[in-house]
Design a protein with these regions (language model features):
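C-terminal cap of thioredoxin/glutaredoxin-like
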Residues: 2-7, 34-43, 170-243
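Extracytoplasmic thiol/disulfide redox context detector
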Residues: 2-117, 197, 205-206, 239-243
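Polar alpha-helical coiled-coil and adjacent low-complexity
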Residues: 54, 164-166
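Residue-level detector of short, conserved catalytic/binding motifs and their immediate flanks
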Residues: 69, 126, 217
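Active-site-proximal beta-strand/loop segments in catalytic clefts of secreted hydrolases
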Residues: 74-76, 107-110, 147-148, 222-224, ...
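A broad detector of the eukaryotic-type serine/threonine protein kinase catalytic domain
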Residues: 79, 130, 148-152, 173-181
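Structural alpha/beta surface segment adjacent to cysteine/selenocysteine redox centers
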Residues: 83-163
């Protein structure tokens, strides 16, 4: 009788799934910036400066809400653990923004460009989010949530530019397709954010909080890092209420 042999691709998928599960149980950011600077895309255009709409180009984040507590979230649009965090805690964050409990600052990174078969999905998705931030500042959180509701698998091509534009249209926003087509500077900004996250230090409200971003999601509430499991909604709510 011939023995059944696992296909190498299938084995890799199993190992990846196990690593993700272990990372979530351990409460770590499993989407690690492996390779340091080698994982950082090189910007090919000049990044914008100043502020425009909800985007603080100098601060390297998009702002949502105006509450007294500051929630800083570093994420990569293709990171599956970021998706797990959003699934577990997205409604809590949304509610905290709506009732003016927090100011959410989204810090987009693009190191998983390496995992989208050459399509630079993370960079393109961040550029699309930036288009929304500039043109529709009140819809940043809705578009961010839509990116994760339609999150592609790590290792896939990701969404096309037309699909990224359609996510905005589905929210009732005017077409951002043209903005995405001309998003070279926004892509450069996204890539510069990633480089800065590795060179460090990471500062929040003028004080150092981390040497560098080791992985995503990285979540801080008023400068205090959430170290629980990404899918532990109760622990996240407790930290949010405490600070």
């Amino acid at each position: 009788m011939m023995s059944r042999r696992a296909h190498p691709t299938r084995l890799l998928r199993v190992v990846a799934a196990m690593a993700l599960a272990i990372g979530m149980v351990a409460g770590v950011a499993a989407c690690s910036v492996i390779g340091g600077d080698s994982s950082v895309p090189v910007a090919t255009a000049k990044a914008p400066t100043g502020t425009d709409g909800a985007v603080d180009f100098d601060g390297r984040f998009l702002t949502v809400g105006s509450g007294p507590k500051h929630l800083d979230l570093w994420f990569d649009p293709m990171c599956p653990v970021c998706g797990a965090f959003e699934k577990a805690n997205g409604k809590t964050i949304d509610a905290a923004v709506r009732d003016d409990t927090i100011t959410l600052r989204l810090h987009p990174l693009t190191f998983l460009d390496r995992s989208s078969n050459g399509t630079a999905y993370s960079t393109r998705a961040v550029a699309a989010l930036t288009c929304v931030g500039v043109r529709h500042p009140n819809s940043v959180l809705a578009y961010y949530e839509s990116l994760f509701a339609h999150q592609p698998e790590e290792g896939s091509d990701g969404l096309t530019d037309k699909q990224l534009a359609a996510l905005a249209t589905d929210l009732g926003l005017t077409d951002i397709g043209g903005c995405i087509d001309r998003s070279g500077p926004y892509q450069a900004w996204a890539q510069a954010n990633t480089a800065a996250s590795q060179s460090g230090p990471i500062t929040v409200d003028g004080r150092k909080v981390l040497d560098r971003i080791e992985g995503t999601p990285t979540v801080l509430i008023d400068g205090k890092q959430f170290t629980g499991s990404v899918d532990d909604a109760a622990a996240f709510r407790a930290l949010l209420a405490k600070n």
